[in-house]
Amino acid sequence: MSEQALSTFDRAREALDKKTRYVQDFPEKGVLFEDLTPVLGDAESFVAVVDAMAEAAEKLNAEIIGGLDARGFLLGSAVAYKLGLGVLAIRKKGKLPPPVVTQEYELEYGTAALELPSEGIDIAGKNIVLIDDVLATGGTLGAARKLIESCDGHVSGYVLAIEVPGLGGRDNLGDRPVIVVRDPQ
């Protein structure tokens, strides 16, 4: 990695380390929640994280940025703007008017679904980089990949701000590159 790339990622890691808010026992007992809201609300920190994510997305040959509902919209939109690309909002079920394409996936206690409009956007044959704030189990990102592939798009990789270690998230993402700004490995 070049010296410029290191300084970009170092600035982003520093911003994440300084501004992330940690909440014990949320959303349930035993979980340490990493809230990136203060990172997003601080201009310098936000720019540092977006710069690093944009650099990563560019290396993955992004033609479109796919942002996952909801913080992935914020990060993905900023990355797409920085790179001069379009952004694909990958929505939770029921947020888009029909017709839609739907991909269901398993949760710990039940199922959920992601959707894209089936009209008005052509992703066939395009390299899409998926962006979100946190990689945990990888279930949502894996479902997003299946959704995009069902529309003949190609997921060229994943870019995340942080990763929760020990949840096996990367195992659910297949063989595509995963770049985490604050990588626990």
Swiss-Prot record:
Q: What is its EC number?
A: 2.4.2.7
Query: What does UniProt give as GO cellular component?
Result: cytoplasm
Q: In which pathway does it act?
A: Purine metabolism; AMP biosynthesis via salvage pathway; AMP from adenine: step 1/1
* Tagged with keyword Transferase: yes
Provide this UniProt record's keywords sorted from A to Z: Cytoplasm, Glycosyltransferase, Purine salvage, Transferase
Enzyme class, UniProt record, top EC level: transferase
Give the catalysed reaction(s), semicolon-separated: AMP + diphosphate = 5-phospho-alpha-D-ribose 1-diphosphate + adenine
Q: Which InterPro entries match?
A: Ade_phspho_trans, PRibTrfase_dom, PRTase-like, UPRTase/APRTase
Location relative to the cell: Cytoplasm
Q: Read off the HAMAP family from this record.
A: Aden_phosphoribosyltr
Q: Which family does it belong to?
A: Belongs to the purine/pyrimidine phosphoribosyltransferase family.
Subunit and partners: Homodimer.
NCBIfam families cross-referenced by the UniProt entry: PRK02304.1-3 (NF002634), PRK02304.1-5 (NF002636)
What this chain does, per the record? Catalyzes a salvage reaction resulting in the formation of AMP, that is energically less costly than de novo synthesis.
Tell me the protein's name.
Answer: Adenine phosphoribosyltransferase
Encoding gene per record: apt
